[in-house]
Amino acid sequence: MKKLSFQQIILTLQNYWQDYGCAILQPYDAHVGAGTFHPATVLRCLGTKPWSVAYVQPSRRPGDSRYGMHPNRMQHYYQFQVILKPSPDNIQDLYLKSLECLGLDLKTHDIRFVEDDWESPTLGAAGLGWEVWCNGMEVSQFTYMQQIGGIECRPVAGEITYGLERLALYIQGVDEVKELDWNGQVGEKALKYGKVDFEAERQFSKYNLELADSEMLVRHFKDSEEQCEWLVKKNVPFAAYDECLKASHAFNQLNALGVISVTERASYVLRVRHLAKICCTKWLEMNE
């Protein structure tokens, strides 16, 4: 079997989960730290209505800035997110079959489910979960979503988050993300991951760690916080949640700069969690 390019990995996962019955959504157009922060997960996992979706989500974690010098850690990367609500009994088997569709031989690769109950303090979200390791490196997270915004998820949703770059390293048999085959072409049309993303990775690392204006970020956080609370009162929780995400990203940028103390960090986490909770509460109130 020919090794899949990075874009073919995404297309294969989209086709696999589409055939299962998932709606294939598009990435959310905001700065988020993980696919979980997409409103298709945060808001739609709440309530009793069935919801099965899959989508790619570009994700940003300023604290993981490495100037493009680390083999598999970046401040900007891609996740593939699957939400199955209610969670089917065979969700683990579905996941393993998806790996086989990607060309991973489960007999030659050491695939392990390592217990790791998941929690997002800023979202007020938690669930029973497992990291999925391939040959000792985490490539996916598998969670039974039990709580979001401090609200119980009934029914429980199953969440699968694929780390696309790390999976691609094993699928293509290369050691560094920048060497990944992006488009499966040869000659002048060939593109590697490094040519697509790594100049931006270098520049954003410099911004995240050296150039970002901490005073401006504090103002941005406060503005988004106030706007979120006001929009919830106006009964537009989707718009309010956008402001929650802006506040969350401003906090992550401040944290990456190293300008907030441990006590201040805890306070910021609680403030973002409050925003997530009021957005979730209002959305549920309007949709159940």
From Swiss-Prot:
Write down the InterPro entries for this protein, in alphabetical order. Answer: aa-tRNA-synth_II/BPL/LPL (IPR045864), Gly-tRNA-synth_heterodimer (IPR006194), Gly-tRNA_ligase_asu (IPR002310)
Name the family.
Answer: Belongs to the class-II aminoacyl-tRNA synthetase family.
**Protein name, please?**
Glycine--tRNA ligase alpha subunit
Starting at the broadest rank, the lineage of the source organism is: Bacteria, Pseudomonadati, Pseudomonadota, Alphaproteobacteria, Rickettsiales
Q: Write down the EC number.
A: 6.1.1.14
Catalysed reaction per UniProt?
tRNA(Gly) + glycine + ATP = glycyl-tRNA(Gly) + AMP + diphosphate
Q: Where in the cell is it found?
A: Cytoplasm
Which organism is this protein's natural source? Rickettsia canadensis (strain McKiel)
A GO BP term here is:
glycyl-tRNA aminoacylation
